[in-house]
């Protein structure tokens, strides 16, 4: 049996990097306060095929993620858009209609983290 060596962040062999820290979504809008109620954290891993757009939708809760592979372009109803590449963090729009699109030739893979309360929907479809 191998013995376990305990280390602290920053010790030899442990690398930590801040992907994103902000109080605003990717378009610069301030994030809302967290809702009151029993907390619920959800983490989703998504894979999006090449040349695929997700449906227009909104979020009522703060959510953020990391692009693991590929590129994600997010387009807001205002026309503002931004591309996120592998390794980059994204802080989503809250209360603004938007959609994501994989415009690349390879799969897009990302992990999203949602911070809400029991009973809150992660997103709502928002057709034009």
Regions found by a protein language model. Give the residues of each.
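N-terminal post-signal-peptidase region of extra-cytosolic proteins
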Residues: 46-52, 60, 69, 96-99
């Amino acid at each position: 049996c191998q013995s376990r060596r305990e280390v602290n962040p920053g010790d030899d062999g442990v690398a930590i990097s801040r992907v994103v820290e902000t109080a605003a979504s990717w378009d610069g809008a301030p994030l809302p306060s967290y809702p009151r109620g029993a907390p619920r954290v959800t983490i989703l891993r998504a894979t999006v095929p090449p040349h695929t757009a997700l449906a227009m939708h909104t979020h009522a809760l703060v959510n953020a993620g990391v692009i693991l592979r590929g590129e994600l372009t997010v387009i807001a109803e205002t026309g503002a858009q931004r591309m996120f590449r592998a390794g980059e963090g994204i802080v989503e729009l809250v209360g603004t209609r938007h959609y994501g699109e994989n415009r690349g030739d390879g799969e897009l893979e990302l992990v999203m983290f949602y911070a809400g309360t029991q009973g809150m929907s992660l997103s709502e479809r928002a057709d034009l």
